[in-house]
C-alpha cells in the first residue's frame, strides 16, 4: 500500500497532485497519507468551496486509474525509485533509527532497510491495482 499511496498522493509526481493541483488548479494543496499500522489512507486538500465537488470526482477518477491498472509505468517506477532514495538517505537519521526500533519492538517488524527496499522493487502493477481495489470510503468530511 505504501507504493500505491505514493502514486496516489504523497509525491510530487502523484496523480492527485499532478492532475487536481497542477493540471486543473482546483486546490492549493492536495495529498494522501497512509497510516501503515491502521490501514487507513487519508486524502486532504485545501481549496475554494466551489471546487469541492469537482475535486471529489477527480479524486475518485485517480483512484480508479490505479484500481483499473490504467496508469503509466513511469508513475510506478518513479514512485518506487523515490521511496528507495528516501529510505537510503534517511537510513542514518535519528528519527529513522527510532522508527526502526519501534517497528522491531512494538510490531515485531524485523525488516532491515535493504529488505524494505527489496520489497519495494518487487511491487508490480497488479500489486498496486489489487491493494487499491481494497480501498473503501469510510468518511467524507468537509470543513468550510
PLM feature spans:
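Mature, solvent-exposed C-terminal subdomains and processed small-chain segments of exported/organellar
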Residues: 1-41, 46-144
Amino acid at each position: 500500500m505504501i507504493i500505491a499511496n505514493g502514486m496516489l498522493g504523497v509525491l510530487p509526481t502523484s496523480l492527485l497532485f499532478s492532475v487536481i493541483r497542477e493540471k486543473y488548479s482546483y486546490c492549493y494543496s492536495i495529498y494522501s497519507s497512509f497510516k501503515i499500522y491502521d490501514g487507513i489512507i487519508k486524502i486532504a486538500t485545501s481549496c475554494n468551496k466551489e471546487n469541492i465537488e469537482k475535486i471529489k470526482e477527480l479524486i475518485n477518477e485517480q483512484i480508479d486509474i490505479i484500481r483499473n491498472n490504467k496508469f503509466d509505468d513511469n508513475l510506478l517506477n518513479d514512485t518506487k525509485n523515490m521511496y528507495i532514495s528516501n529510505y537510503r538517505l534517511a537510513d542514518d537519521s535519528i528519527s529513522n533509527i527510532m522508527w526502526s526500533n519501534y517497528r522491531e519492538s512494538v510490531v515485531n517488524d524485523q525488516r532491515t532497510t535493504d529488505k524494505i527496499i527489496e520489497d519495494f522493487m518487487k511491487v508490480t502493477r497488479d500489486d498496486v491495482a489489487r491493494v487499491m481495489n481494497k480501498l473503501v470510503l469510510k468518511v467524507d468530511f468537509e470543513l468550510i
